From Swiss-Prot:
Function in brief: Catalyzes the ATP-dependent ligation of histidine to the 3'-end of its cognate tRNA, via the formation of an aminoacyl-adenylate intermediate (His-AMP). Plays a role in axon guidance.
Protein name in UniProt: Histidine--tRNA ligase, cytoplasmic
GO cellular component: cytoplasm; cytosol; mitochondrion
Annotated catalysed reactions: tRNA(His) + L-histidine + ATP = L-histidyl-tRNA(His) + AMP + diphosphate + H(+)
Organism encoding this protein: Bos taurus
Alphabetical UniProt keywords: Acetylation, Aminoacyl-tRNA synthetase, ATP-binding, Cytoplasm, Ligase, Nucleotide-binding, Phosphoprotein, Protein biosynthesis
Family (UniProt): Belongs to the class-II aminoacyl-tRNA synthetase family.
Length: 509
């Protein structure tokens, strides 16, 4: 048995090595060599008839969430939802799966990541890729032209996930969108304000919101000499500039996508620029870009946007970044993406972006794709990358070794002597009926020490102790678990006293 266990360990390690090489896109020869080693080890292992072949695990790119993790997630959701409601949003929900043709042609090169389903009824279906396209379909179906809504739900992507960095195949998105015909840039500015409010409230670190405009990108590509047919594919290359160097992006555009080197160089002169409203004003004077109608419209709107952002007090958090491209096909105007910053390695250097935590933009043409008459409904919105935020919060709590409360129980109903189960049940029923979050131990005669230990382990702040003397006196002994202080409270006053002592918002830690 020991030899077999050792072989199983070798097979597992070799299997992980093969998977790692595939993810790193190693050479075919190297992968084949390691696969051969794996097959040789499996052959040595031979069949094990007594061992079940089924491996109990979650599918790739998914995970279970423990009560501790869910407590953190609910706290994050509460912050996000309260902000959405503060800005007047209504909530909607849509099906997890859509007709395949609803999603087709909306995501550019990312369309290959859509999960398709087989349906016995004959319909071609796909799992939703995001919450934006289903929202546009909802508007068109219901002939709505004006709504401010939020939607928090799971979406699905057939990706190669890096779960350690908060990337999955099944994950939550938290979306806020404003649909309707309004004066320019007012809804867009509010979306950026919401993004900043949420990220500041979550206290996950310094962040920067990059903004650009799809019209500026398209105008820039046009004056640089990019053929119309290559706009979107070149756009997806530029969008990688936050992850790889300009040289790598240029090599992809020239080598893989057939763009002329001199055209790529002209693009490079623009997309490596970033700044504030001064850069917008500089580009408005650019002799070539200012002659392009689309780019001029985009720059004019960005200038107005910065005026509103200054009034909202968040202009210092915003950077006009010409490399921001956002690969999705449906964006038509302003686009934005929030990244967390890590401190510079040396004095004088700029902080580095370490990952997107929110993004969004304007998509005025998406609803028209679903309307029989092509009627457009202007829309702008944002999506909070909650999975990455969850990962950051969890890592921070682990590093600080902070205890997380997994329940909101305010009080444990306990007894100091035996044969008081009926009294405990009567009291806890009174507390539940009064809206108090209460528990008791499921034993007829639990020891008082065990009841107090349970409170310390689970973070319950108060214990309501029933004893024979307390019953005679018509009082309940209320004990603070933290201070161990005990006071007698008249039974009719107990509910109000518990509410008074636990009126502070419950913390996750």
């Amino acid at each position: 048995m020991a030899d077999r266990a050792a072989l199983e360990d070798l097979v597992r390690v070799q299997g992980e090595r093969v998977r790692g090489l595939k993810q790193q896109k190693a050479s075919a020869e190297q992968i084949e060599e390691e696969v051969a080693k794996l097959l040789k080890l499996k052959a040595q292992l031979g069949p094990d008839e007594g061992k079940p072949k089924f491996v109990l695990k979650t599918p790739k790119g998914t995970r279970d969430y423990s009560p501790r993790q869910m407590a953190v997630r609910e706290k994050v959701f509460d912050v996000i939802i309260s902000c959405f409601k503060r800005h007047g949003a209504e909530v909607i929900d849509t099906p997890v799966f859509e007709l395949k043709e609803t999603l087709t042609g909306k995501y550019g090169e990312d369309s290959k990541l859509i999960y398709d389903l087989k349906d016995q009824g004959g319909e071609l279906l796909s799992l939703r890729y995001d919450l934006t396209v289903p929202f546009a379909r909802y508007l068109a179906m219901n002939k709505l032209t004006n709504i401010k809504r939020y939607h928090i739900a799971k979406v699905y992507r057939r990706d190669n996930p890096a779960m350690t960095r908060g990337r999955y195949r099944e994950f939550y998105q938290c979306d806020f969108d404003i649909a309707g015909q309004f004066d320019p840039m007012l809804p867009d500015a509010e979306c950026l304000k919401i993004m900043c409010e949420i990220l500041s409230s979550l206290q996950i670190g310094d962040f920067l919101v990059k903004v650009n405009d799809r019209r500026i990108l398209d105008g820039m590509f046009a004056i640089c000499g990019v053929p119309d047919s290559k706009f979107r594919t070149i756009c997806s290359s530029v969008d990688k500039l936050d992850k790889v160097s300009w040289e790598e992006v240029k090599n992809e555009m020239v080598g893989e996508k057939g763009l002329a080197p001199e055209v790529a160089d002209r693009i490079g002169d623009y997309v490596q620029q970033h700044g504030g409203v001064s850069l917008v004003e500089q580009l408005l004077q650019d002799p070539k870009l200012s002659q392009n109608k689309q780019a001029l419209e985009g720059l004019g709107d960005l200038k107005l946007l910065f005026e509103y952002l200054t009034l909202f007090g968040i202009a210092d958090k915003i950077s006009f970044d010409l490399s921001l491209a956002r690969g999705l096909d449906y964006y038509t105007g302003v686009i934005y993406e929030a990244v967390l910053l890590q401190p510079p390695a040396r004095a004088g250097e700029e902080p580095l972006g370490v990952g997107s935590v929110a993004a969004g933009g304007r998509y005025d043409g998406l609803v028209g794709m679903f309307d029989p008459k092509g009627r457009k409904v202007p829309c702008v919105g944002l999506s909070i990358g909650v999975e990455r935020i969850f990962s950051i919060v969890e890592q921070r709590l682990e590093a600080l070794e902070e205890k997380v409360r997994t329940t909101e129980t305010q009080v444990l109903v306990a007894s100091a002597q035996k044969k008081l189960l009926e009294e405990r049940l009567k009291l806890i029923s009174e507390l539940w009926d009064a809206g108090i979050k209460a528990e008791l131990l499921y034993k007829k005669n639990p020891k008082l020490l065990n009841q107090l230990q349970y409170c310390e382990e689970t973070g319950i702040p108060l214990v309501a102790i029933i004893g024979e003397q307390e019953l005679k006196d018509g009082v309940i002994k209320l004990r603070s678990v933290a201070s161990r202080e005990e006071v007698d409270v008249r039974r009719e006053d107990l509910v109000e006293e518990i509410k008074r002592r636990t009126s502070q918002p419950l913390c996750i830690c």
